[in-house]
Amino acid sequence: QNRQCCESNLEPLFSGYIETLRREAECAEADSGRLSSELNSLQEVLEGYKRRYEEEVALRATAENEFVALKKDVDCAYLRKSDLEANVEALIQETDFLRRLYEEEIRVL
């Protein structure tokens, strides 16, 4: 009888414990589905950010290449301008020389 008394006292205790574990398992299963859905959503967002980052990297590379090309063009234009300014200065000096020479010849005549 003592054994039967212990079994009957423990059975409700274990039944309650089992029920609690079942509820926790159901909650864990529900959380698993929710978390799986959230994970998928976050992975999609991450993929979007990765694509955008790669696009921005490509745009930056393109911009850097364009900058290098423009810098070459500007450097060439600056050198051309310097050459033209030197030519203008040389022509001004030649014109002044020829004018003075002409004036001297006129004076001599």
From Swiss-Prot:
GO terms for biological process: intermediate filament organization; keratinization. It holds the Pfam family Filament. Residues 1-109 form the IF rod domain. One of its GO terms (cellular component) is keratin filament. One of its GO terms (molecular function) is structural constituent of skin epidermis. Keywords: Coiled coil, Intermediate filament, Keratin. Residues 1-10 are annotated as: Linker 1. SUPFAM superfamilies: Intermediate filament protein, coiled coil region. It comes from the Eukaryota. InterPro entries: IF_rod_dom (IPR039008), Keratin_II (IPR003054). The keyword Membrane does not apply. Residues 11-109 are annotated as: Coil 1B. Belongs to the intermediate filament family. There are two types of cytoskeletal and microfibrillar keratin: I (acidic; 40-55 kDa) and II (neutral to basic; 56-70 kDa). Wool microfibrillar keratin. This is Keratin, type II microfibrillar. It comes from Ovis aries (Sheep).
